[in-house]
Amino acid sequence: AFPQRVKVVEVGPRDGLQNEKSVVPTPVKIRLIDMLSETGLPVIEATSFVSPRWVPQMADHAEVMQGINKLPGVSYPVLTPNLKGFQAAVAAGAKEVSIFGAASELFTKKNINCSIEESLERFSEVMNAARAASIPVRGYVSCVLGCPYEGNISAAKVAEVSKKMYSMGCYEISLGDRIGIGTPGSMKEMLAAVMKEVPVGALAVHCHDTYGQALANILVALQMGVSVVDASVAGLGGCPYAQGASGNVATEDLVYMLNGLGIHTGVDLQKLMDTGTFICNALNRRTNSKVSQAACRL
């Protein structure tokens, strides 16, 4: 039995643009988010309050947050890796934040230069500040179906990290297959383990299409009761670990599949495709959305 409705979390402006080589002008980012707001998407991850030294693409985070037209009923979460980022985000008007963890020790070490345990301790500072400010926090767990450095990751480890982030107060845990290596079988096994520790209503999946498995993996998650799915307009965001490989699943393709299954999303597919066309033209690249590629030929 599929869920009757699915909340689509648009991650293109943050996770998508973050991997773009050339810096995207601030007005283009603002226009992208404003167009996405008009599609009916309920959640649009807007930017990341990380140090510009680490991610130059997101250096304009405050300008973006203050420049976008925030529609009622739409949330605009931002990624905040630490307390400093959290404070800057709140100062810029953020009403929801995300923290980014991983189920791989080596990935955590290379990504934020500490152990998983230490990363969770760092998050507790953000969690406490967020609680005091009544700001909801979403937790990402990366490398849930494999790691670019460690290879296989056990479902038990994913469940353990997810449980810790959930019990710290994250209202939703987004399980991310950053390298897109998972298949429906490994997705099913991993979700079964995590669902023993975290209620399915608090889970989301974040699938990359690097190996062409994203929609199949999402379908399995839906069958298991997951009703929140992350996606990126036009499939923006390559894979940082595999040059030229596709990254995030395209929001257009996800919505097309959900429409076909009769699952309600509230998203206008045509407006979404127009937004994909806009950002691809602005970036001078072709879309990674199969639906948009097909529509171009009609």
From Swiss-Prot:
The keyword DNA repair does not apply. Pathway: Metabolic intermediate metabolism; (S)-3-hydroxy-3-methylglutaryl-CoA degradation; acetoacetate from (S)-3-hydroxy-3-methylglutaryl-CoA: step 1/1. It is found in: Mitochondrion matrix; Peroxisome. Pfam families: HMGL-like. Its EC number is 4.1.3.4. Keywords: Acetylation, Disulfide bond, Lipid metabolism, Lyase, Metal-binding, Mitochondrion, Peroxisome. One of its GO terms (molecular function) is hydroxymethylglutaryl-CoA lyase activity. Its main location: mitochondrion. GO terms for biological process: ketone body biosynthetic process; L-leucine catabolic process. PROSITE patterns: HMG_COA_LYASE, PYR_CT. The active site is at 239. InterPro entries: Aldolase_TIM, HMG_CoA_lyase_AS, HMGL, PYR_CT. Coiled coil: none annotated. The keyword Lyase applies. Belongs to the HMG-CoA lyase family. This is Hydroxymethylglutaryl-CoA lyase, mitochondrial. It comes from Gallus gallus (Chicken). The lineage of its organism: Eukaryota, Metazoa, Chordata, Craniata, Vertebrata. The gene is HMGCL.
